């Protein structure tokens, strides 16, 4: 019997075939202080551990439910020292399997081949691969040296070319560059056709959040991403949030699965939100 030639596997979309996969250097580093990941160094609140230990085993067999979680997130924001100048509805809060999943969903919902993703350089490394999956063109404006200052005028100029999405990491990972709330709102107001996404994963460490003052009715092209990974120590459970105009949140959530956030993450999130004092102590 003659040998048959191997049959090649089906090709993916051209955008995926050209894509260089994004991977984090995880292997062989457990138990080490991984400063490049900026992980919480003391772990989550004891309330989180207690809630997970009490999680009913029979609930593992059923799909997760999210009743009350959006309300708890909003209540947590309202109770913070900065508060909320404009109330949020539950339709303005999206739940995601970590902020990475939210970033992916934003690009999937809003990016098309040939569209431009505008961002800075260096910045969080997952923005560009997500844009590449959709065939978008990435325009990365370098930070200003010395000091890695935010390239405000260059971003203003680039927005005149009407990019599809502007991704702002504030404060920026890895440079720590900060952009004032006033400048974030200015950029969003100057580019109504551009979705301006503010990744606020580290905002608790600087207090630069736009959430306390933004009116999403006025800045309907602004979307804010948050997580409980860094501050509350839930990185291993993967839960993130998006805040914005209800229509934008709806569009982004349409491209996600109905059960992307698992039940243990939901349980941990409720517990972490109920013990804000623990998180505040860690951040301080």
Question: Residue spans of the language-model regions?
Answer:
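Conserved core of the PLP fold type I
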Residues: 57-189, 202-219, 223
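The start of beta-strands in P-loop NTPase/AAA+ ATPase cores
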Residues: 31-33, 164-165, 194-195, 221
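A general structural signal for well-ordered alpha-helical segments in protein cores
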Residues: 13, 45-49, 63-71, 103, ...
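Donor-nucleotide binding loops and adjacent catalytic segments primarily
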Residues: 182, 195-198
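N-terminal small-domain helix-loop-helix segment of the aminotransferase-like
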Residues: 2-98, 105
């Amino acid at each position: 019997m003659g040998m048959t030639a191997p049959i090649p596997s089906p090709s993916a979309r051209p955008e995926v075939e050209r894509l260089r996969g994004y991977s984090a250097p995880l292997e062989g580093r457990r138990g080490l202080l991984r400063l490049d990941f900026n992980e919480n160094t003391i772990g989550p609140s004891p309330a989180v551990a207690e809630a997970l230990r009490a999680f009913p085993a029979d609930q593992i067999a059923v799909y997760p439910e999210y009743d009350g979680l959006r309300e708890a997130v909003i209540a947590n924001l309202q109770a913070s020292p900065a508060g909320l100048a404009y109330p949020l509805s539950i339709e303005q809060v999206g739940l995601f399997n970590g902020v990475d999943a939210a970033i992916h969903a934003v690009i999937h919902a809003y990016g098309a081949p040939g569209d431009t993703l505008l961002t800075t350089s260096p910045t969080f490394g997952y923005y560009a691969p997500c844009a590449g999956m959709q065939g978008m063109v990435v325009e990365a404006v370098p930070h200003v040296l010395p000091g890695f200052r935010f390239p405000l005028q260059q971003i203003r100029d680039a927005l005149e070319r009407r990019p599809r999405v502007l991704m702002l990491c504030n404060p920026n990972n890895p440079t720590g560059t900060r952009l004032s709330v006033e400048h974030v709102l200015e950029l969003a107001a100057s580019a109504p056709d551009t979705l301006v996404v503010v990744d606020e994963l580290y905002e608790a460490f600087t207090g630069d959040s736009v959430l306390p003052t933004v009116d999403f009715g006025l800045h309907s092209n602004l979307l804010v991403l948050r997580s409980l990974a860094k501050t509350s120590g839930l990185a291993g459970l993967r839960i993130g949030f998006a805040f914005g105009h209800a229509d934008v949140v709806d569009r982004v959530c349409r491209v996600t699965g109905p059960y992307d956030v698992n039940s243990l993450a939901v349980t941990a999130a409720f517990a972490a939100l109920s013990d804000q004092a623990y998180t505040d102590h860690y951040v301080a």
